[in-house]
Amino acid sequence: MQKKYVVALDQGTTSSRAIVFDHDANIVSVSQREFTQLYPNPGWVEHDPMEIWASQSSVLIESLARAGIHSDEVAAIGITNQRETTIIWEKDTGKPVYNAIVWQCRRSSEICEQLKAQGLEDYVRENTGLLLDPYFSGTKIKWILDNVPDARAKAKRGELLFGTVDTWLLWKLTEGKVHVTDPTNAARTLLFNIHSLSWDTKLLEALDIPAAMLPEVKPSCSVYGTTRIAGEGSEIPLAGIAGDQQAALFGQLCVEPGMAKNTYGTGCFLLMNTGNKAVRSSHGLLTTVAVGAQGEVNYALEGSVFMGGATIQWLRDELGLIRDASDTEYFASKVADTNGVYLVPAFVGLGAPYWDPNARGALFGLTRGANRNHIIRAALESIAYQSKDLLDAMIKDSGERLKSLKVDGGAVANDFLMQFQADITDVEVLRPSVCETTALGAAFLAGLAVGFWTSVTELKYKACIDKHFKPNIDASQRERLYAGWQDAVARTRS
């Protein structure tokens, strides 16, 4: 049968999805299944690894059935995944020794403090590009080995395997034949030296993690093994892996230095490609691994906005100013500006480039003439201002000129927000026709690995732009608006 399709497995924090793409990068079918979130203690977040696998394998089968596609028509399967989430299982039985500890989980905070006390903070920053934080996998591994009965002894005997979610899915899809990850996921473990592109012996020793547990690291654009869907049909190559944010960067074809993307979700995730240069940030950004045009390792700067879409949820759920997130564009467009109102949504503190956990949200500039429309507009503008804060930090750190800003995520449907983002950053904002860029990135990597597509040049004709948003205000207005934002932020921190 002719190979007509590539399937992307998109394993996220709350659901598992499978998306089928044709040769023109059009979506043919989507299947999605949510799974259980476990909160055994305050600040702890877990998933059942077997439920992750069951949900992901079922949507893979379902996505083909919905489209009426035979598995023999599938050229390759790519994987993208929630990063940092940690799974440890028995090599012989494939049975997890504990639930998956999710990236959001804070239980290993004390281990991070111990590493800081050992003077490892700067070493971690220099060699992994990360901060010493329970967000990343390394301290989660140590917690499992320290707290699950007999786990450390088994690990030292070579009986246990570790993997992030990509590795777990590969292991299951190949029936235990392949124990592999890619550099984008390895770089989020706190154990991977992003310069030598190898596991860091000093950090493994500091956390007392046996190297034999760790997966082999192979390029993001590779064939790792094969699988049969539901045990039927021919073997399908498993080819192409990237963590979710790096997959979105590749799906947007940000493969050259200075190219950046912003994913607008509950928060916002911004990544800028810095080419073959691992830039150490002086603004609190992370240095991480990305994927280049030939599938080679590139580097990127990464920063996140804590309150993106969550700010709009606050307008809806706590203030009752809107019924639906889509209402914000209508109300914001009813006024010419915010009437001097600024909202700083520091509800959980401020992230990069401020890193101020004590800052709190505030509304500034309220007068008797301020109304609902002004507050809603200020909320939307706050998302763009926070994104500009990060983009400016990336430009200063990298020395790269921002060529354009590629965007994806739910909020990109809001034309007002996209236009204001272009205005305040003074750069063209590009919204793709296919906003499923995370899955598209995994599909592109898989398709390139097996020759379904020949090059990134060919992909540029597949990744179409839906709309260009060009800056539409003058420099003096931009400077005045942003100065007002900076003043508001400063006052939330005093």
Curated annotation (Swiss-Prot):
Chain positions recorded as sn-glycerol 3-phosphate binding sites: 13, 83-84, 135, 244
Positions of ATP binding: 13-15, 266, 309, 313, 410
PROSITE patterns found in the cross-reference section: FGGY_KINASES_1, FGGY_KINASES_2
Top-level division of the source organism's lineage: Bacteria
Transmembrane portions of the chain: none
Recorded metabolic or biological pathway in which this protein acts: Polyol metabolism; glycerol degradation via glycerol kinase pathway; sn-glycerol 3-phosphate from glycerol: step 1/1
One GO cellular component, as annotated: cytosol
GO MF, one example: glycerol kinase activity
Catalytic activity: glycerol + ATP = sn-glycerol 3-phosphate + ADP + H(+)
Annotated keywords: ATP-binding, Glycerol metabolism, Kinase, Nucleotide-binding, Transferase
Positions of ADP binding: 13, 17, 266, 309, 410, 414
EC number: 2.7.1.30
Amino-acid positions noted as binding glycerol in the UniProt annotation, renumbered to this chain: 83-84, 135, 244-245
Gene Ontology biological-process annotations: glycerol catabolic process; glycerol metabolic process; glycerol-3-phosphate metabolic process
Description of activity control: Inhibited by fructose 1,6-bisphosphate (FBP).
Record's function text: Key enzyme in the regulation of glycerol uptake and metabolism. Catalyzes the phosphorylation of glycerol to yield sn-glycerol 3-phosphate.
Entry's family note: Belongs to the FGGY kinase family.
Name the record gives this protein: Glycerol kinase
Organism per entry: Shewanella sp. (strain ANA-3)
